[in-house]
Curated annotation (Swiss-Prot):
Superkingdom, natural source: Eukaryota
The protein's name: Citrate synthase, mitochondrial
Keywords noted in UniProt: Mitochondrion, Transferase, Transit peptide, Tricarboxylic acid cycle
Name of the gene: cs
Chain positions recorded as oxaloacetate binding sites: R359, R431, R451
Length: 469
């Protein structure tokens, strides 16, 4: 539930101008301050007070029912988390602090000569609810550049991993090892007051986001570029540009793609595995390094972070079997054969969305602009015309439309990043922007240890009056 969702609910229940105070403050706050921590320090007390008043008046209000199917079905659709930074609308897709992806593409600052939003701007938006100025985004870029250096023990660790260790395992382990630098862990051990927790969560989150491209690039170079140096951070470049430089890519279009990729993969509400994991682990007052590392272990699971690889494998198999130019009729037959074999068409459908994922749409627009004649893009575009109709005809899919994973791998392949095992690391670098923004707010709002009630099957049967035999 985003702060906009909470605000609408509060406005409806309280019928008071005070309920919209935080939203108005966020939208109209002075743009003169470039220090993100100072902006947060101003916003937090207001939001604390707003939620306190809301809970006092409506804390016992019922907001939904829980069914047996929900309990057995992965808690799908169950309202059980407060998550401020983004909300997923089944029809409109993700909204970052109330802004759709097209709105973010239009409103967020861009690099000189660029057309895609800078992830630094999205991070500012996620943290504050405010669309940042160019000066504020530049401040974030320079701040991350200043914090980017890796401690020597993490570098040594990365350089000594076996080459058969999966990139995500290396990524998660390196993030965990950064825990040695945690301001939050140190402050907690020294007895800091809980009202100050957010300050140290903020410092750790800023440090971690700054260092992630260095970790990710080092993994890439070690595995796929014979251990060549990632080079030095350039404080005059934005976060994405430094990342692509360290990866070894100099194409300006690839840097633009990375800006788009890191923006649109950053957050997707709070119930997905990586976001929920970071929230859960963080609720134990584990520091941001430990919470994010746990989230990355969840992202590494095939049901969460490996979907774009599965899309590419399926597309490659399609090409191998049918050849280069594929007729619509042959493609329909191939799709039906996939479905009749008990498999799914990877990249299509979504647990929540009921229309084309706007993250797919903006990648499609990027491809139409920069690589309209690429054979793989043409194949993806052809599938977009055919797959939804086949899925509707089959009658099983609640959502026959493509999601973000149907397109991202094709774009990366076009610019030369063909190492599919690495793609989830890029996803992880991006997802840090969302889950760490929320982690700071979770500590600021004093969210408690997450501890839902579990039940046995016998207990559930007894609860609903069913026979256990």
């Amino acid at each position: 539930m985003s702060f906009l969702t909470v605000n609408r609910l509060a406005s409806k229940l309280l019928n008071s101008k005070n309920a919209t105070y935080f939203l108005v403050a966020a939208r109209n706050a002075s743009a003169s301050t470039t220090n993100l921590k100072d902006v947060l320090a101003d916003l937090i007390p207001k939001e604390q007070n707003r939620i306190k008043n809301f809970k006092q008046q409506y804390g016992k209000t019922n907001i939904g029912q829980i069914t047996v199917d929900m309990v057995y079905g992965g808690m799908r659709g169950m309202k059980g988390l407060v998550y401020e930074t983004s909300v997923l609308d089944p029809d409109e897709g993700i909204r970052f602090r109330g802004y759709s992806i097209p709105e973010c593409q239009k409103l967020l600052p861009k690099a000189a000569g660029g057309q895609e939003p800078l992830p630094e701007g999205l991070f500012w938006l996620l943290v504050t609810g405010q669309v940042p100025t160019e000066e504020q985004v530049n401040w974030v870029s320079k701040e991350w550049a200043k914090r980017a250096a890796l401690p020597s023990h993490v570098v040594t660790m990365l350089d000594n991993f076996p080459t058969n260790l999966h990139p995500m395992s290396q990524f998660s382990a390196a993030v965990t090892a950064l825990n040695s630098e945690s301001s939050f862990a140190r402050a907690y051990s020294e007895g800091v007051h809980k009202s100050k927790y957010w300050e140290f969560a903020y410092e750790d989150s800023m440090d971690l986001i700054a260092k992630l491209p260095c970790i990710a690039a080092k993994i890439y170079r070690n595995l796929y570029r014979e251990g060549s140096s990632i080079g030095a951070i350039d404080s005059g470049l934005d976060w994405s540009h430094n990342f692509t430089n360290m990866l070894g890519y100099s194409d300006a279009q690839f840097t633009e793609l990375m800006r788009l990729y890191l923006t649109i993969h950053s957050d997707h509400e709070g119930g997905n595995v990586s976001a929920h994991t970071s929230h859960l682990v963080g609720s134990a007052l584990s520091d941001p390094y430990l919470a994010f590392s746990a989230a990355m272990n969840g992202l590494a699971g095939p049901l969460h972070g490996l979907a774009n690889q599965e899309v590419l494998v399926w597309l490659t198999a399609l090409q191998k079997e049918l050849g280069g130019e594929v007729s619509d009729e042959k493609m329909r037959d191939y799709i039906w054969n996939t479905l009749k074999s008990g498999r799914v068409v990877p990249g299509y459908g979504h647990a929540v969305l009921r229309k084309t994922d706007p993250r797919y749409s903006c990648q499609r627009e990027f491809a139409m602009k920069h690589l309209p004649n690429d054979p793989m893009f043409k194949l993806v575009a052809q599938l977009y015309k055919i797959v939804p109709d086949v899925l509707l005809e089959q009658g099983k899919a609640k959502n026959p439309w493509p999601n973000v994973d149907a397109h991202s791998g094709v774009l990366l392949q076009y610019y030369g990043m063909t190492e599919m095992n690495y793609y989830t690391v890029l996803f992880g670098v991006s997802r840090a922007l969302g889950v760490l923004s929320q982690l700071v707010w979770s500590r600021a709002l004093g969210f408690p240890l997450e501890r839902p009630k579990s039940m046995s099957t016998d207990g559930l049967m007894s609860l609903v009056g069913a026979k256990s035999g």
